[in-house]
Amino acid sequence: MTTQQIFNLAIEMGIANDFRPRIRIEKHLKRIRGKYEKLPKDEKKLFDKKKMENPYIDSGVHFDAGIKNVKRVMVGIDIDSAEMMIARYLSNHNPKKEIDLVIAHHPIGKALADLSDVMHLQADVLEQYGVPINIAEGLMKIRIDEVSRGVNPINHFKVVNTAEMLNISLINIHTPIDNLVAKFVKTKIDKDQPEYVGDILQSLLQIPEYREATKNGSGPVLFTGSPDNRVGKIALTEITGGTEGNAKIYEKLAMAGIGTIIGMHQSEEHRKEAEKAHINIVIAGHISSDSIGMNLFLDELEKKGIEIVPCSGLTRVSRVKNKK
């Protein structure tokens, strides 16, 4: 596989596991293409045409060294210049097993600058859980603007420049990976049908990545509520969609009948608002959840004979081997 083919596989898996129906994603891309066609000629030159084809613009191919048959990839949750240097070091010291591609999860380069563009996904998910779309979009717009301003001053291309100088291909896969773990956890919870909040924690602890995280002090934890509380209606609104949404959404979710939310991570401001709304918050874990999603994708690469070198917080669990 080439670097681009690996990236395309990730995007397709992201679409297949998106909480939104495929037709909704296709309509979104069609709408962007329509807006592009109406732009003046000068503005078209500045427009990122990838936005018309890639529904997850917080993910991208940042540098492609042109390797036609990727055999070995180094994969981490966060990739910076240090990890790129490690990839070059490993390649230099073992030329027969060079690192052909480095894969990051969290956004870098242009994907980081565009992080807020994928957050519209959250409004669609909130609507599925009973929040009127006008309220979901209104609250999300405020938060999207905040995130856009927040990432604006960051040195987005630091690690991308390093990849170019070292001549090592670099991509990142963010929302597609988050979609994978969101669907995976939802399937697990739907199967187990927990009655009490404590049952959710026990269900999550049956997943290898969460068990390992617990050993390391960062396993699933209850942020609000009690293990003895009944779960009510469960929502997975804080696993995919870029980053945290608007803290004011919990009141609306409670009014929509949501009793428990399962998320990756949560700020103190969001926790307090959820507590006011009497919603149980189960935090599965950030890096461990990212590892689950990444592992589900990496299993597909492993099936194609690509060797995986985990780094930077990735807990590698191969479900391909477990099926044997």
Report each predicted region and the residues it spans.
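Active-site catalytic microenvironments in core metabolic enzymes, especially phosphate/sugar-handling
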Residues: M1-K324
